Amino acid sequence: MNHFELFGLPLQFQLDGSLLSSQFRDLQRQFHPDKFAIASERDRLLAVQKAAQINDAYQVLKNPISRAEYLLVQHGEDIRGEQQTMQDPMFLMEQMELREELEDIADSSDPEDALFAFEGKVSKMYKQQLSAIQQELESEAWLEAADRVRKLKFIAKLKNEIELVEDRLIG
């Protein structure tokens, strides 16, 4: 049973987050190990394993990057944990320029405004990549979607770096 089946969801990238959360809570209640406290040792072990499976599946499905990776795995493209280098030199150049721009923000005349504007630009890029991933997965363009997920990971990492800079500027 795949993660989508476990939660009674269609095998697709776009999902209803509130339905996912609701199904998660229902499954947690149904398979909570405490409900099996007086059951046989075997049933207790199965409940613990099922609870772990539910938690793992929820973590995968609630995150758009891991959800896209999981969908790709379901269709024969496993890019999880790969160390493949990005083959798009234009994208890599853009990423280097963005990181340089982020480094320069601390030295700008108004670093907080500069960071806010930069964060908006990167968030827009992130949303554009998500939208493109959804379209590519819907059209079953698995290789293109895999490349797009790789790019999205770069942008997600940049978003994390923005948060670190923000913490340094504020704190």
From Swiss-Prot:
One of its GO terms (molecular function) is protein-folding chaperone binding. It comes from the Bacteria. GO terms for cellular component: iron-sulfur cluster transfer complex. Residues 2-74 form the J domain. Keywords: Chaperone. GO terms for biological process: [2Fe-2S] cluster assembly; protein complex oligomerization; protein folding. Co-chaperone involved in the maturation of iron-sulfur cluster-containing proteins. Seems to help targeting proteins to be folded toward HscA. Interacts with HscA and stimulates its ATPase activity. Belongs to the HscB family. This is Co-chaperone protein HscB homolog. It comes from Vibrio atlanticus (strain LGP32) (Vibrio splendidus (strain Mel32)). The gene is hscB.
